[in-house]
């Protein structure tokens, strides 16, 4: 009995050891067990078929948000766009600066990358149809735009005026001494024979004849001022047959503005142009008489005519592109076209 009891007790102890060894340890549950197949745990998980996840588990990746997704799409689109070609750097070339016998001096010059198509694009942006205004458009801008459209239509209806070309400059020989030559820059005059013919035709006008006969002191119409009239005819750009009496007095008035300091003598042009003389207008300083005269409809008409003359004078000045100054050489060249003309005898130096 004792031997059998001891055997059963030993067997019970062995079974207890086996059962205790098979119970899972809390630390061993958390640590992953090695697979009996010899593969790592990561490889076994990748081979498993994904099923429905647990209700509390988020299947989305942890660090991917909506902003990251948009950023990724934007980066993909930017990679697909072709790269813009940058403008080439300006090249430099060597040009001949001076050549003396067999010696040659070179100079490094940069080639400009500007092409004619760039000028065309720039000029197209300056066309009247281009809108240079900012995007914020107000009511005042709308009125201004409507006025601009109306002015464009009126300009299209009216024929465009052809302005006179700018005078060119040439080099002429002033002095020649042996192998040395002295050059002088000279401006080519734009005065043509047709301008002289238009001037001579206007001298036959009875009003202009009367005006020149009245100016005995040559304070308004000496030979230089009359030569400036011909120069202005060449710069205004009108055909010779279009010059009338008003153009003669406009040019003469503008010539007096440029050369004379006294303002009173040229005011007589108004009275000869509109059929009156200076002697018919009384010079009375009585304010009451002047007030009654201002209320006279004839006086108001005279003021409106003078205002119209000043407006035409400004238009005539603009038609010459503001080139109202005439050099002494050009005036002498105009007089040399027909030196025997009776107009060139109107010299102030002979009167004194």
Curated annotation (Swiss-Prot):
Disulfide bonds: none annotated. One of its GO terms (molecular function) is protein kinase binding. Residues 76-90 have a biased composition (Acidic residues). InterPro entries: Speedy (IPR020984). Residues 18-40 have a biased composition (Polar residues). Pfam families: Spy1. It comes from the Eukaryota. Residues 1-90 are annotated as: Disordered. Belongs to the Speedy/Ringo family. This is Speedy protein E16. It comes from Homo sapiens (Human).
């Amino acid at each position: 009995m004792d031997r059998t009891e001891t055997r059963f007790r030993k067997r019970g102890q062995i079974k207890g050891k086996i059962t205790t060894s098979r119970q899972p340890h809390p630390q061993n549950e958390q640590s992953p067990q090695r697979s009996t197949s010899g593969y790592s745990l990561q490889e076994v998980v990748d081979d498993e078929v994904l099923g429905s996840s647990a209700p509390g588990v988020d299947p989305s990746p942890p660090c991917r948000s909506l902003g990251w997704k948009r950023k990724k799409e934007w980066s993909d689109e930017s990679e697909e766009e072709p790269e813009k070609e940058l403008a080439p750097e300006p090249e430099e070339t060597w040009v001949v600066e001076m050549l003396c016998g067999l010696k040659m001096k070179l100079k490094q010059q940069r080639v400009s990358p500007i092409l004619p198509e760039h000028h065309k694009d720039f000029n197209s942006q300056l066309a009247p149809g281009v809108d240079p205004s900012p995007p914020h458009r107000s009511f005042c801008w709308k009125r201004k735009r409507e006025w601009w459209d109306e002015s464009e239509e009126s300009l299209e209806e009216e024929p465009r005026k052809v302005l006179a070309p700018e005078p060119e400059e040439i080099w002429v020989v002033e002095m020649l001494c042996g192998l040395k030559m002295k050059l002088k820059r000279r401006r080519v005059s734009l005065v043509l024979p047709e301008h002289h013919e238009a001037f001579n035709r206007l001298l036959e006008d009875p009003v202009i004849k009367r005006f020149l006969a009245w100016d005995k002191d040559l304070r308004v119409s000496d030979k230089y001022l009359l030569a400036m009239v011909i120069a202005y005819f060449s710069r205004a750009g009108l055909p010779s047959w279009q010059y009338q009496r008003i153009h003669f007095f406009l040019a003469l008035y503008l010539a007096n503005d440029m050369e004379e300091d006294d303002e009173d003598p040229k005011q007589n042009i108004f009275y000869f142009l509109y059929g009156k003389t200076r002697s018919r207008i009384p010079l009375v300083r009585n304010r009451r008489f002047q007030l009654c005269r201002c209320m006279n409809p004839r006086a108001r008409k005279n003021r409106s005519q003078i205002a119209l003359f000043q407006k035409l004078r400004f238009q005539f000045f603009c038609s010459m592109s503001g080139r109202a100054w005439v050099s002494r050489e050009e005036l002498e060249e105009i007089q040399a076209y027909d030196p025997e003309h009776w107009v060139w005898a109107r010299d102030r130096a002979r009167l004194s």
